[in-house]
């Protein structure tokens, strides 16, 4: 379902942002 994809993408984007901040 499209909504599930959006949620997954949002979570992945947040994880990437956190990793960037941690570096």
Curated annotation (Swiss-Prot):
Residues 7-23 have a biased composition (Basic and acidic residues). The lineage of its organism: Viruses, Duplodnaviria, Heunggongvirae, Uroviricota, Caudoviricetes. This is Major prohead-scaffolding core protein Gp22. The gene is 22. Residues 1-23 are annotated as: Disordered. Gp22 functions in head assembly. Internal peptide VII: Cleavage product of Gp22 that is incorporated into the mature phage head.
């Amino acid at each position: 379902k499209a909504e599930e994809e959006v949620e997954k993408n949002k979570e992945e984007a947040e994880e990437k942002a956190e990793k960037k901040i941690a570096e």
